[in-house]
Amino acid sequence: MAWSQRIEQALVKRRLDGQYRQRHPTGQADGRTLSVAGHNYLNFSANDYLGLSHDGRVVRAWQQGAERYGVGAGGSAHVTGYRAPQAELEHQLADWLGYRRALLFISGFAANQAVIAAMMAKNDRIFADKLCHASLLEAASLSPATLRRFGHNQPSALAKLLAAEGEGETLVVTEGIFSMDGDRAALKPIHQLARDRDGWLLVDDAHGVGVCGEQGRGSCWQQGVQPELLIVTFGKAFGVSGAALLCSDATAEYLLQFARHLIYSTAMPPAQACAIQAALGCVQQGDDLRQRLAANITRFRQGARGLRGQLASSDSAIQPLIVGDEQKVLGLARRLRDRRCWVTAIRPPTVPPGTSRLRITLSAAHRENDIDHLLEALHATDGE
């Protein structure tokens, strides 16, 4: 089969299955609104949970950082790309989250891939929640370790898998708050199970850090758990981009020697690190923002009662409305756009077959009347 035939067949099948993805260039966008093709919408698809992407303190920090350090790092952190703002940010993150070290990555995807690729060896075992992010599952499947997936958020299922004897090291992988369902991992029993097997726990808390726990320290802090490997990202509640791994001194030094995503990639721009430092300050002092977000979540869930779709059991900013069929959820998303609500339809392979959904995300930037407008639109389109 020629390359062109393979590509065309894959695209045709993706269209026929109702799973074809498209991008929509947006104009002005923030945690509350966005514009597409000249039309303005209330934005219920962003991960800007605290509305910090347009916060003046964060924007000015990036501008001032760019004026001082330029707009790029100019090289790998192992060459000339590691500057004072990145070093300061790593120290601040480690101190804030109670770890010895933090290492910056250009994205959460890169952090997850780098850690698993560098840490795992033949005969090792990875036990991952079935609904973990694609970056985690892909890295695990490509590693030399054996991957076993346990039932979503089921410590008992994990315990059964862990009971089998193995030769190498054990790594348990989960998320703090799951990106497509919005529910929280049972971190305490999961961590205890890993420790009982002399294993380590890796938690990707992309959707928890900033929005839960004291000072927004995240899911692990909230549940009183300190995993051996903690990934936090800055593209959600922090409103910026990038990620960090929190770990021990020895683990950090090991990854600086063996994590190819760190060694062979241009480092995070110093100006970006300046913006993240400013966002960190906003997060630490952001109890009012978290209270506003919590109020918006409560308002939405109370008003969503009676909708025909299945509203997932979630108290996080991620509020999935399960519709099931791909074409139905696409039609519902279009009808919501007609009412000036931008809500993204999520379909397989991102979510399991038969669970296509509207992934509704809420922000502290939303106003009460924004939530009410969305609810009115959902109820109006529910039977169409």
Curated annotation (Swiss-Prot):
Listed cofactors: pyridoxal 5'-phosphate
Modified residues (N6-(pyridoxal phosphate)lysine): 236
Enzyme class: transferase
InterPro entries: Aminotrans_II_pyridoxalP_BS (IPR001917), Aminotransferase_I/II_large (IPR004839), AON_synthase_class-II (IPR050087), AONS_Archaea/Proteobacteria (IPR004723), AONS_Proteobacteria (IPR022834), PyrdxlP-dep_Trfase (IPR015424), PyrdxlP-dep_Trfase_major (IPR015421), PyrdxlP-dep_Trfase_small (IPR015422)
Binding residues annotated for substrate, in chain numbering: 21, 133, 350
One GO molecular-function entry: pyridoxal phosphate binding
CDD domains: KBL_like (cd06454)
Pfam families listed in its UniProt record: Aminotran_1_2
Gene3D superfamilies cross-referenced by the UniProt entry: Aspartate Aminotransferase, domain 1 (3.90.1150.10), Type I PLP-dependent aspartate aminotransferase-like (Major domain) (3.40.640.10)
Gene Ontology biological process terms, A to Z: biotin biosynthetic process
Enzyme Commission number: 2.3.1.47
Domain of life: Bacteria
Reaction it catalyzes: 6-carboxyhexanoyl-[ACP] + L-alanine + H(+) = (8S)-8-amino-7-oxononanoate + holo-[ACP] + CO2
Pathway(s) the chain acts in: Cofactor biosynthesis; biotin biosynthesis
UniProt entry keywords in alphabetical sequence: Biotin biosynthesis, Pyridoxal phosphate, Transferase
Binding site for pyridoxal 5'-phosphate: 108-109, 179, 207, 233
Its biological purpose: Catalyzes the decarboxylative condensation of pimeloyl-[acyl-carrier protein] and L-alanine to produce 8-amino-7-oxononanoate (AON), [acyl-carrier protein], and carbon dioxide.
Family recorded in the similarity comment: Belongs to the class-II pyridoxal-phosphate-dependent aminotransferase family. BioF subfamily.
Subunit architecture: Homodimer.
Protein name as annotated: 8-amino-7-oxononanoate synthase
Organism: Erwinia tasmaniensis (strain DSM 17950 / CFBP 7177 / CIP 109463 / NCPPB 4357 / Et1/99)
Organism lineage string: Bacteria, Pseudomonadati, Pseudomonadota, Gammaproteobacteria, Enterobacterales
Gene field: bioF
